[in-house]
């Protein structure tokens, strides 16, 4: 199976071009004002024009108001929504769009295999479950987590697509993919020179590392 790749937190046209050239399957825009990678709907709409056919655009939110999501839907027309806050299943599903639900593995209640699997099952209509590390704030922490916590999710026959995040970079992504065999990985700070400024070299290195694992697994 080929591991899909999403490069998240894009803020510049040249970084979209780098991700696309390297073979990324999706790019992500962050609509969380507290993030250093935040873009507003108007800017995201400009960036979206640089994304070619067959590369998905993902819109990331943290506890948004419905009107904030609607503004992104109207301006950007994302292919997928991604919720990283305390959104309920009803919050995520109210827009009638495909969505990813993020879980901060290791957070209170999500610090055991059973607890994490139980939380995931509440979002059975999600297009995928994304697993990031726990930190005090919202959004990506840039840190890894114990992948053993995913055992209950991996054993669940009703599991949705597993998207692995949390501190991934060119130097560790191969081991992470080999251990978890996720449907996809989601990377942001691990391919940056500065917050919101991606490195074309790091993106290429990341993609090459993932491809090397996928080729062996065939």
From Swiss-Prot:
Q: Which domain of life is it from?
A: Bacteria
Specify the enzyme's EC class, one word.
isomerase
Q: Where is the signal peptide?
A: none
Alphabetized UniProt keyword annotations: Amino-acid biosynthesis, Aromatic amino acid biosynthesis, Isomerase, Tryptophan biosynthesis
Query: Which pathway is this protein assigned to?
Result: Amino-acid biosynthesis; L-tryptophan biosynthesis; L-tryptophan from chorismate: step 3/5
| UniProt cross-references to InterPro entries, sorted A to Z | Aldolase_TIM (IPR013785), PRAI_dom (IPR001240), RibuloseP-bd_barrel (IPR011060), TrpF_fam (IPR044643)
Its EC number(s)? 5.3.1.24
KW Amino-acid biosynthesis (keyword) present = yes
Q: Which processes are annotated in GO (biological process)?
A: L-tryptophan biosynthetic process
Decide whether keyword Manganese is in the record: no
Write out the catalysed reaction.
N-(5-phospho-beta-D-ribosyl)anthranilate = 1-(2-carboxyphenylamino)-1-deoxy-D-ribulose 5-phosphate
Q: Name one GO molecular function term.
A: phosphoribosylanthranilate isomerase activity
Task: State the similarity comment.
Answer: Belongs to the TrpF family.
What this protein is called in its record is: N-(5'-phosphoribosyl)anthranilate isomerase
Organism from which the protein derives = Bordetella parapertussis (strain 12822 / ATCC BAA-587 / NCTC 13253)
User: Organism classification, top ranks?
Assistant: Bacteria, Pseudomonadati, Pseudomonadota, Betaproteobacteria, Burkholderiales
């Amino acid at each position: 199976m080929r591991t899909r790749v999403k490069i998240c937190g894009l803020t510049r046209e040249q970084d979209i071009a780098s991700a696309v050239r390297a073979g990324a399957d999706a790019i992500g825009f962050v609509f969380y004002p507290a993030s250093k990678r935040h873009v507003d709907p108007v800017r995201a709409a400009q960036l979206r024009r640089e994304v070619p056919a067959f590369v998905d655009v993902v819109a990331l939110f943290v506890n948004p108001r419905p009107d904030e999501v609607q503004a992104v839907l109207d301006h950007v027309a994302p292919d997928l929504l991604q919720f990283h806050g305390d959104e309920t299943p009803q919050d995520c599903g109210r827009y009638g769009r495909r969505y990813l639900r993020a879980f901060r593995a290791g957070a209170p209640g999500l610090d055991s295999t059973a607890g994490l699997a139980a939380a995931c099952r509440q979002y059975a209509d999600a297009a995928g479950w994304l697993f990031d590390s726990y930190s005090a704030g919202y959004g990506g922490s840039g840190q890894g987590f114990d992948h053993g916590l995913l055992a209950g999710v991996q054993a669940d026959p009703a599991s949705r697509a597993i998207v692995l995040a949390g501190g991934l970079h060119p130097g560790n992504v191969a081991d992470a993919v080999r251990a978890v065999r996720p449907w996809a990985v989601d990377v942001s700070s691990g391919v940056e020179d500065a917050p919101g400024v991606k490195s074309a070299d790091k993106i290429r290195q990341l993609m090459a590392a993932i491809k090397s694992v996928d080729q062996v697994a065939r």
